[in-house]
Amino acid sequence: MGKTDLSSLLAEKLKARLVLENPEENPFLLDFYNEKKRYAFQTQIFFLLSRYKQQQNFLEHDLFMKKVISDYFFEKDKIFASVNLDEKELFLYERIYSLLIKNVPKPDLILYLQSDPQTLYKKLRKKRKKQFQKIELDYLMALNEAYNRYFFHYDETPLLILNSDDFDFQKNPSHLDELLELLKKPQKGRRYYVRR
């Protein structure tokens, strides 16, 4: 089960609004997976601006919504940019990013689903969408390393880290109940949760 499926389950159980990213909207994504260097900047800027727009729409329309579950956090864009862009592109990207991030709300909690890149690679191979078929294991390993490095230093909001390889939220309802109980507890700092 991926982040989108888990977000959907959590939103349903917690009666929360669900906010999903939509990578299929990005007209550069398939080109990026075919020619990373050539299409990285366009792909990344499109994602940055579309995620920013989604965050702004969310702020305008849901001022009184108490619970919101999203399958991404805005800062993820910067993690991908650090892997995908060359030095000059990253410099320009970071200038744009720094202007936008000021207006993006911070989440109350980030749930980081860690997964072994090999396991993730196998799961992506089973998906039918074209863009997932083009993703290489080396790329997943680089992203995994970038995420781990980012979250090792992250302290802006509470962070709960789970190894998603230890859970099967769809097939085993007790795993979802376990997570829901965990989410009811006050969240502070960085916490790792390991199933026993």
Describe every region a protein language model picked out:
Residues 19, 70, 109-111, 160-162:
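Hydrophobic/aromatic beta-strand patches that form the interior of the parallel beta-sheet core
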Residues 23-26, 74-76, 115-120, 166-169:
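Conserved nucleotide-binding/hydrolysis micro-motifs of P-loop NTPases
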Residues 8, 12-50:
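Conserved substrate/cofactor phosphate-moiety recognition/catalytic segment
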Residues 125-133, 138-196:
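NTP-dependent small-molecule kinase module
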Residues 3-4:
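Walker A/P-loop
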Residues 39, 43-105:
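Glycine-rich phosphate-binding loop used to anchor ATP phosphates in small-molecule kinases
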Residues 77-148:
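A glycine- and Lys/Arg-enriched "phosphate-lid" helix/loop adjacent to the NTP-binding pocket
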